[in-house]
Amino acid sequence: GLDAIVCKKALHSNCKKFLNRIHLGKLTYLVLTVQSLFTMDTAEAVVECGDNHKIYRLHKTIFAAAMNLQAEGGGVPMAPHASCTDGMLSLSSAHGIPKAITFFCLPFLVAAKHEKIRGFTTIESPVIRVHTSKPVVRHADGAYCGDVRNVEFTCLSEKLQLLK
């Protein structure tokens, strides 16, 4: 989704290099987010919840982020009701919103007031599978993980897995 595209672009961005040189590197994310918002392709997505097999269809998906905390690493509270102790994941998504309107919705997202806006959806389940109509950029906590069409997220209750 949008955040993943921004993370991927930031890896090799001349904008980031320039802004870092003039000590304004923190603006990189904002500049690339606005630029990407108007140029990115959206995708059709099918979300399947593993606990009840409920299916959600998200049209013109801008992003879908699976989280077990209220805010992502950058501090944006995309899942304001998420809890790391309930064994559930919260899939926060934006879909079916015209790009120009999405730009004006960003402040509501940052203020955790986006859930009442049509096109923002939060789905909760211990297992979430997302299937998209075309490969989309995926990242994990800001690290680029490739372009994929299918991904499964699972909340492992009372577990902490570390990479070797």
Give the residues covered by each predicted segment.
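Long C-terminal subdomains/extensions of small-metabolite kinases
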Residues: 1-164
